[in-house]
Structures are given as structure tokens and as C-alpha cells.
């Protein structure tokens, strides 16, 4: 199975306008897997578009805390998605140990609901979970310590680096709890400006990939000043070593 995927949020405008064509273009680049967002609202478009283009979606992003979790997990199961990842919890919830514990408890509870649908739960970081420190440790690692083993992690290596962490070292500490990583590059600005295809920015991509050799590698752009499909194709070329 390929270890390469792409987050559909990267091409959210194109996907909203024409999901079928967007998935076709990503498949033409060479992707066989995608990471959707908003599985409930996009379930019909994804059901048709994935099948038509020979794509699968092993992971997806969807808000879980405070959401209609049975509906999310039912849609995920219908689409063959095995891991549903909560994409963010707001920065103010990462400053106090009690708030961090509450977030961990909420995802641990969500994992029990997900299991009824044969789906797993995960969490995806931004920079603020790493920037915030609790007794000298990154809030993200304090949080990870409190998760049930059934809850996976998707480490956004760009945001972790922007938050002040050595992403490769972080991956090493978290170990096989990391089931997926987001791979992007650029100047590490927290406002998402200056993002670049993999291998063209400041992130030590080779070290990051070596630190999580079995994790799904999900290409993502929060923003890009140019043609997003060309940028995604450049990342695909870099990550596959296809220099044709």
C-alpha cells in the first residue's frame, strides 16, 4: 500500500466547485489516496468521486468534540475511512492542564463511539499545541500521555516545527502512536504564508520521513501563492523520487 496521500483541504475551492474534477486531477498526478475533510457534508461527492477515480481515503478530518459523532463515523465507515482525525482544538484550550485533560477525555470517549463503527479516532496539531508549555513540556506531549491507546496522532510536521519543536525528534518520542504525518514546506510562518512544495523550504523533510517510516505521508497546503495542483504535483514528485 502506498504511504502517500493528499489533504483535500489543500484544494478546497476547487473541490467545492467541482469535486469530481478535483479528484480526477489528483488521481492524474499519481495519488491513489486522499484525506477528505467534512465527511458528513461531502459524503455523496466522495462516494462517487473516490470510486470513479480509483481512490481510497484511509484517513479524514472532521470535527469530533461537540459534534454528532455517530453521523461522522457512519459516513466515514461508508466511505471506507478507517481513521477520523479531529483537525484542531482552539489555542486557548492548550494553556491549562485541566483543559488539556478535558480534551484528551473527550477524544477517549469519542474513540469508544468510533469503535462501534469499526473506525479509529485521531488528533492533528497546529503550532500552538507545541508552543504552549506545561512544566517545560509541550502541551501536545502532555496531551498525548493522557490518550487512550485507541486514539492515534497525526503530526503536522510543518506546524510542529513552526511551534518550536524538532519535528523528527518529536516523532521519535511519540513512536508508533503516529499513524499519519502532514508533509509541507516553506518559511514556517504561522499565518500560512510562504508555504512551498516539499523539499523547497526550511523543513528537514528527509529527517522527518526517516523518523516516521511507517506513517501515512499526507501532502498539504494551507495556502499557496500559485497553482495548487502544480504545487501538489511537485510535492508528489519529490516524495516519490519520480524525477521524470
Locate each region found by the language model.
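Histidine-acidic metal/acid-base catalytic patches
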Residues: 1-28, 40-43, 77-82, 117, ...
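Hydrophobic residues in well-ordered beta-strands that form the structural core
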Residues: 57-59, 85-86, 123, 155, ...
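Active-site acidic/histidine proton-transfer and metal-coordination neighborhood
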Residues: 33, 65-152, 173
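Catalytic beta/alpha-barrel core
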Residues: 34-40, 61-65, 154-157
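Active-site-adjacent beta->alpha loops and helix N-cap segments on the catalytic face
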Residues: 38-49, 93-95, 99
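Short, surface-exposed connector motifs at secondary-structure boundaries
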Residues: 26-33, 51-57, 150-153
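Active-site mouth loops of central-metabolism enzymes
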Residues: 5-17, 59-66, 94-98
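Alpha-helix-loop-beta-strand connector modules within alpha/beta enzyme cores
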Residues: 47-62, 108-110, 114, 141-148, ...
